[in-house]
Structures are given as C-alpha cells and as structure tokens.
UniProtKB/Swiss-Prot annotation:
Family: Belongs to the universal ribosomal protein uS15 family.
Superkingdom of source: Bacteria
SUPFAM superfamilies cross-referenced by the UniProt entry: S15/NS1 RNA-binding domain
Protein name as catalogued: Small ribosomal subunit protein uS15
InterPro entries found in the cross-reference section: Ribosomal_uS15, Ribosomal_uS15_bac-type, uS15_NS1_RNA-bd_sf
HAMAP family documented for this protein: Ribosomal_uS15_B
Molecular-function annotations in GO: rRNA binding; structural constituent of ribosome
UniProt keyword annotation of Zinc present: no
GO BP annotation list: translation
Role summary: One of the primary rRNA binding proteins, it binds directly to 16S rRNA where it helps nucleate assembly of the platform of the 30S subunit by binding and bridging several RNA helices of the 16S rRNA. Forms an intersubunit bridge (bridge B4) with the 23S rRNA of the 50S subunit in the ribosome.
Keywords of this entry: Ribonucleoprotein, Ribosomal protein, RNA-binding, rRNA-binding
Listed GO CC annotations: cytosolic small ribosomal subunit
Length: 89
C-alpha cells in the first residue's frame, strides 16, 4: 500500500527545512524510511512476495545513496537526521 497523502504531508511538515520544501534530502529520506518500515511489515507476513522484496531493496538503496550524499556534504545535518529517524548508522 502506498503512503497516503495525509501521512506524507505530516512527514514533510516534520522534516522540511523551510515552508514548501518537499525535495530536500531530509524529506526524501524520511519518506523513504516510512515506506521501508511499512514494506518490512508486509514482507514479514508475506515471505514469498519477491516483487515487494525487490521494491524494498530499491528503496533501501535509494535511501543509502541519499544518506551518503548528505554525510559527504553536511555531516551535522546527517547526524541530526539519523538521530531523529532512529537509524542505526
């Protein structure tokens, strides 16, 4: 199931750097993290759903690349983001 518009707007409001910000790295990573967590729950119930598993891996790779970009360009923003999202990195 895709992320609802209300939930996405809630995440955007929480992680936006300024009003109208929908494309910053923080917002993209936060939305991807929600989607990854949601897909993880689905995969736990439906272990043989390989198409969803592949989509999950693509989202994880996209988030990894965005986090690497943020870490390379602004370490402080990177640390704040991983702490607020509760990521293990």
């Amino acid at each position: 199931m895709a992320i609802s518009k209300e939930k996405k707007n809630e995440i955007i409001a929480q992680y936006a750097r300024h009003e109208g910000d929908t494309g910053s790295v923080e917002v993209q990573v936060a939305v991807l993290t929600w989607e990854i967590n949601h897909l993880n729950e689905h995969i736990k119930q439906h272990k043989k759903d390989h198409a969803t598993y592949r989509g999950l891996m693509k989202k994880i790779g996209r988030r990894r690349n965005l986090l690497a970009y943020l870490r390379k360009n602004d370490v402080n923003r990177y640390r704040e983001l991983i702490n607020s999202l509760g990521l293990r990195r």
